[in-house]
Amino acid sequence: MNQLNALKQFTTIVADTSDIESICKYKPQDATTNPSLILKAVSSSVNKRFIDQAIEYARKKGGSYNYKIVNASDKILVDLGVEILKHIPGYISSEVDARLSFNKEKCILKAKKIIDMYEEKGISRNRVLIKLAATWECIKAAEELKKNNIACNLTLLFSFAQARACAESNVFLISPFVGRIYDWYLSQNLILKNPADQDPGVLSVCKIYDFYKKYNYKTIIMGASFRNVQQILSLSGCDRLTISPVLLKELESSNKELNRKLCPPTSFLNPPVPLTEAEFRWEHNQDEMAVQKLSEGIRNFGKDQLSLEKIFSKLI
């Protein structure tokens, strides 16, 4: 049995791509997208029909020039998601504009709009996860959205404080970024390249997993942003792992033995008192890496969203 199929025995595999061919090949349960992947998809001639559909939709909706651009951007996000859902049995994760990451109310409105657009295409909200950056505002938005049966995927998660706040707000799923944590420690010369069991990104997810399972939190942990197969193998047994096509191929090509690394306990403890907003901000602020990477991630996803809108600005 190859490592990909072995991993599927105790971890749900999610494809970190909007490429339909890769999704069909590796047969993941779910798929995730982000502004960078959407921008990449839009840049491919294969997806020209989605661009045309988005422009037509925006023109029909009318409104100001800027309003049309926003509607076109939302439409292509949803249409690509609908197409991906034809090839997977589970969830598609679609991301809210990162520029809204510090505005709870606007995140809620955008999330509801995206869900409405999916439902207009006949897709149940039970198959869509709304991706939000794991800021305090977005965590609280996700908590409120869940009351409307809208499940969220809290992304750009780098600190233990973020993970704890998500669990305490009962969000559906988190995406701790293994590779980006590793990148930061490597860039600071704080670790050796490929440190195996001492990989700080892997250790971060292990700590979150142990905390969640010890206190029986229901939030799903989906490790993300992998740089190599060893990081993935070190997290075998994690609830979910979202993996790029390149690393899915590498796993499929290997028949080496794979052992489960993460296992849930058989008994639980009563959870601690939830963090207040002030406690969350202080604890997160104590983690230099997390502060830098969250800020950088929001900025970069914001830039990609702006690039997508610039493409539509020339076509509408």
UniProtKB/Swiss-Prot annotation:
Under the heading Gene3D superfamilies, the entry gives: Aldolase class I
Q: Which UniProt keywords apply?
A: Cytoplasm, Pentose shunt, Schiff base, Transferase
Q: Which residues form the active site?
A: K131 (schiff-base intermediate with substrate)
Q: What is its main location?
A: cytoplasm
Q: Name one GO cellular component term.
A: cytosol
Which pairs are disulfide-linked?
none
User: Which GO biological process entries does UniProt record here?
Assistant: carbohydrate metabolic process; pentose-phosphate shunt
Question: What are this entry's molecular-function GO terms?
Answer: transaldolase activity
Asked if the keyword Cytoplasm belongs to this entry, the reply reads yes
Where would you find this protein in the cell?
Cytoplasm
Q: Which CDD domains match?
A: Transaldolase_TalAB
Part of which pathway? Carbohydrate degradation; pentose phosphate pathway; D-glyceraldehyde 3-phosphate and beta-D-fructose 6-phosphate from D-ribose 5-phosphate and D-xylulose 5-phosphate (non-oxidative stage): step 2/3
Q: Which reaction does it catalyse?
A: D-sedoheptulose 7-phosphate + D-glyceraldehyde 3-phosphate = D-erythrose 4-phosphate + beta-D-fructose 6-phosphate
One Pfam family, short name: TAL_FSA
Query: Is this entry keyworded Transferase?
Result: yes
- Entry's EC annotation: 2.2.1.2
The UniProt entry, under SUPFAM superfamilies, shows: Aldolase
Q: Which family does it belong to?
A: Belongs to the transaldolase family. Type 1 subfamily.
What this protein is reported to do is described as:
Transaldolase is important for the balance of metabolites in the pentose-phosphate pathway.
Subunit note? Homodimer.
Instruction: Spell out the protein name for this chain.
Output: Transaldolase
* Protein species of origin: Buchnera aphidicola subsp. Schizaphis graminum (strain Sg)
